[in-house]
Amino acid sequence: MKLLFQTILRISNQLPKRKTQQKISLLKQKSIEAKLSGGEAKIKSQHERGKLTARERIEILIDPGTFEETDRFIVNQPNEFDDSGEKFLGEAVITGYGKINNKTVFLYAQDFTVLGGSLSQAVANKICKIMDLAMQNGAPVIGLIDSGGARIQEGVNSLAGYSSIFLKNTRASGVIPQISVILGPAAGGATYSPALTDFIFMVSNIGQMYITGPEVIKAVTGEKVSHEELGGADTHASKSGVAHFTAESEADCFNQVRKLIEFLPQNNLDEPSQENEHFDP
């Protein structure tokens, strides 16, 4: 009887450890799956367009080893217009916080490899949450924009998500620095949020901002324009005045963002950084 009791006790002690190990293994597996975003084929397609993936962009922009991702395991919700049943961990945006030149920043990076970076209600919730955290901590928020616009399969829910983001933009205005980096299409509703932020960076030949694309312009007016002519970096830097900075490559663009962060105060209660160097007038 004593031996039986000891055996039962030993097995019962082992069960929680096994369950814990199983959960840890599942967590590691899901983390690897989340890092693949839309899958290897979509990542390859992104590279063929001359663009980096959302995670590659974060690695270049943020100080090494400082990025902490939030809401990594949120998935896209099924709807009646999508019968594929595909689930993407993290949805079409990566959110989190980290350091740039040892200064805390919050950011979101739209992931074009997941359903074209389209905005769903879940994506909007993630973006709004990271903007709230930036406000609570008094730190800049940076948006890496690469999106085809609203996820039309979700109808008004997607559009409602945009309105929530716009509200966050207006409430953060004058309180914390807001920076938008246009690294792909910013079409339709995706255009308004960057326009509400303090600084807009655009990369030539890959970043565009417009309400409607060239196809719609042609159908309505008969005019033929390219994506770059309609909403490229040169157009917004020299004609509309929407863009404040332009760059020839993503790497150059991120260097410019990092440089700007050096000069900005963290929030409206902070003082701008002081230069120790003295220049001869």
Predicted regions and their residues:
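Terminal-region recognition feature
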Residues: M1-I179, L183-Y192, L196-V216, T221-P281
